[in-house]
């Protein structure tokens, strides 16, 4: 069997009890840090789980996933994934391939940044559109996604690139403005270290967010829709120090 276990948002202690049981009962345990990161080292995980943990590279998942699946034919194999296992399409593809080859699969979900941003900001989950990634290699894609979402009055969750190093909100804003200068006037929320207990959440225009020191990664951003529900505005004022002028978006 191949079991996908979500590790949650911050460190190894965010794993669920059910996930912990699966790890301790497994024959082999693997972890991947390509699609996301966790602030726990392999050594810390091994000490916590009392089990050897092998880190997989991107190629192990995308080009050579058949090797993992072959091992799961005769053994209980766990793949640890930061956040929730099925947010990344890579893991859905592995699950599909495994099932087609007769290998049973199981998913043990974990907390995801996709839902955590709603709790940290007060933004309504149903008002989010398509998400995008701001990468170190500049691309028009995030700007296009923001514009498309705003055309339907939806918020945009922006993941920030992790390779070769985690991107900061400041760098992400610079990339967006470099692609489209009009981005600087949009309101957004910057979120740092979700799930750590030491989160930083700030709301302002993009050009002002760039000047804020959010501290160490991991960082994400939400570019706001054209309008806000009055409760979203109240929450942003309270949770994210949003400027009073943001009230003009309430509809």
Curated annotation (Swiss-Prot):
The UniProt entry, under CDD domains, shows: DHP5_DphB (cd11647)
Q: Which InterPro entries match?
A: 4pyrrol_Mease, 4pyrrol_Methylase_sf, 4pyrrole_Mease_sub1, 4pyrrole_Mease_sub2, Dphthn_synthase
The biological pathway it contributes to is: Protein modification; peptidyl-diphthamide biosynthesis
- Asked whether the UniProt record includes Transferase among its keywords, one would answer yes
Q: Which UniProt keywords apply?
A: Methyltransferase, S-adenosyl-L-methionine, Transferase
Q: What job does the chain carry out?
A: S-adenosyl-L-methionine-dependent methyltransferase that catalyzes the trimethylation of the amino group of the modified target histidine residue in translation elongation factor 2 (EF-2), to form an intermediate called diphthine. The three successive methylation reactions represent the second step of diphthamide biosynthesis.
What is the name of the protein in this document?
Answer: Diphthine synthase
């Amino acid at each position: 069997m191949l079991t996908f276990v979500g590790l949650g948002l911050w460190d190894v202690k965010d794993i669920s009890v059910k996930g912990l049981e699966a790890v301790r009962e497994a024959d082999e345990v693997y972890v991947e840090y390509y699609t996301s990161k966790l602030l726990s080292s392999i050594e810390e995980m091994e000490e916590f789980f009392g089990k050897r943990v092998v880190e997989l590279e991107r190629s192990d998942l995308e080009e050579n996933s058949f090797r993992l699946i072959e091992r799961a034919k005769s053994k209980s194999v766990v793949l640890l994934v930061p956040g929730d296992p099925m947010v990344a399409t890579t893991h859905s593809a592995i699950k599909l391939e495994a099932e087609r080859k007769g290998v049973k699969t199981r998913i043990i979900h974990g907390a995801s940044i996709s839902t955590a941003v709603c709790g940290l900001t007060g933004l309504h989950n149903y008002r989010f559109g398509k998400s995008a990634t701001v990468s170190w290699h500049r691309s028009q894609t995030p700007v296009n996604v923001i514009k498309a979402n705003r055309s339907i009055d939806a918020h945009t969750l922006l993941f920030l690139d992790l390779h070769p190093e985690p991107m900061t909100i400041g760098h992400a804003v610079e990339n967006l403005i470099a692609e489209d200068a009009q981005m600087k006037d949009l309101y957004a929320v910057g979120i740092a270290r979700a799930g750590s207990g030491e989160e930083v959440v700030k709301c302002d225009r993009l050009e002002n967010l760039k000047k804020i020191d959010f501290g160490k990664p991991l960082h994400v951003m939400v570019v706001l829709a054209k309008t806000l529900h009055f409760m979203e505005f109240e929450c942003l004022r309270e949770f994210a120090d949003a400027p009073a002028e943001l009230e003009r978006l309430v509809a």
